[in-house]
Amino acid sequence: MATVLIVGKPNVGKSTLFNKLVRKKKAIVEDEEGVTRDPVQDTVEWYGKTFKLVDTCGVFDNPQDIISQKMKEVTLNMIREADLVLFVVDGKKGITKEDESLADFLRKSNVDTILVANKTENLREFEREVKPELYGLGFGEPIPVSAEHNVNLDVLVETIIRKLEEKGLDLESKPEITDAIKVAIVGRPNVGKSTLFNAILNKERALVSPIPGTTRDPVDEEVFIDGRKYVFVDTAGLRRKSRVEPRTVEKYSNYRVVDSIEKADVVVIVLDATQGITRQDQRIAGLVERRGRASVVVFNKWDLVEHREKRYDEFTKLFREKFYFVDYSPLIFISADKGWNIDKVIDAINLAYASYTTKVPSSAINSALQKVLAFTNLPRGLKIFFGLQVDIKPPTFLFFVNSIEKIKNPQKVFLRKLIRDYVFPFEGSPIFLKFKRSR
């Protein structure tokens, strides 16, 4: 699919333009500079034509900190790979040295560029005071738009499509491929989620720095591994609710993380092996389990653990004790930074997804039920007649009983264990239970 990149200095309205073109609020929009840190992408569909649109972080002329430096580095690398660039400038304030510096880079990169003047609600003032100086950037006639007020966006999209087709790119809409495994990478801030994301993709796509909170928008990427399609999503770090101020960028980011979990098939829960398992790690795992998503747990930064060769059993025991509610998850010890065991993470994702989509025959369930009930004492008066699997993603089982009121948590634990031990292990997948009264 053709790729169109939105670039520009901070706060010229790139994310607002992105949201309007993809027709959904996907990129975070705030008045604060530098809100978008990781590239955010989605598909634009226009009268049977489609292309991928990518919103990038604002490019600072002279980045003053490691995050800004990384933001600029990621954006400049993506410019070189794009089919077309939308260079967005402020149509109210005119051009600055930052605009001129970015324009110089775009010209040297020899990438096809459309100059977009945003915030041109007052078109007459724009044409009189700002438009003449835009020609000096070297990209010809600018397209004036107001992303916030949906002005001239149709002209912009039609220009994009014409430019892409002139390059011989195929923009015809194709049926959506739905067989991709959707994987969300989640965890506390600074546990190495973006490093793992980049290690899987074998390229720097998400920002990586030692400063917690570097990732704000979920970053997604399609990738084929051994002929299988995946969509990986790197998410922002989740802190405790009490530590997150309301109506802030971080609060919006947390909503996006939960949304990414709900859209995923498999969630990779990343832990920092140098810090063990915290209460917040448990909360995140509980969120994944309650949302009914398959899961893989990874202890990252294993290379930094002292005497690690002798401590696998210790950490495995810790996992079983603290993550008892998701102890069906494969546990992998990795170093994302050094590339250790990344292949095992992929294998675990495949295993979890296979479990998540498995459906077992009713005969196997009821055979196991009869066998185990022969030597099991149920609560007085409770009878379990038979069961069947009624759904996948997650595997969901319906049991017919004489009294739903007598089904308490111990009976649910018993039935899940019966299924895993005697029918199918469902490694990496939660099991949901439903009950129906029967005589």
Swiss-Prot record:
Domain of life: Bacteria
Occurrences of domain EngA-type G (ranges): 2-168, 181-357
SUPFAM superfamilies: P-loop containing nucleoside triphosphate hydrolases
Domain KH-like: 358-439
One Gene Ontology term from the biological process aspect of the record: ribosome biogenesis
Residues that coordinate or bind GTP 1: 8-15, 55-59, 118-121
InterPro entries to which the protein is assigned, alphabetical: G_ENGA, GTP-bd, GTPase_Der, KH_dom-like, KH_dom-like_a/b, P-loop_NTPase, Small_GTP-bd
Description of how the protein assembles with itself and partners: Associates with the 50S ribosomal subunit.
HAMAP family cross-referenced by the UniProt entry: GTPase_Der (MF_00195)
Family: Belongs to the TRAFAC class TrmE-Era-EngA-EngB-Septin-like GTPase superfamily. EngA (Der) GTPase family.
Protein name: GTPase Der
Species this chain originates from: Thermotoga petrophila (strain ATCC BAA-488 / DSM 13995 / JCM 10881 / RKU-1)
This protein's encoding gene: der
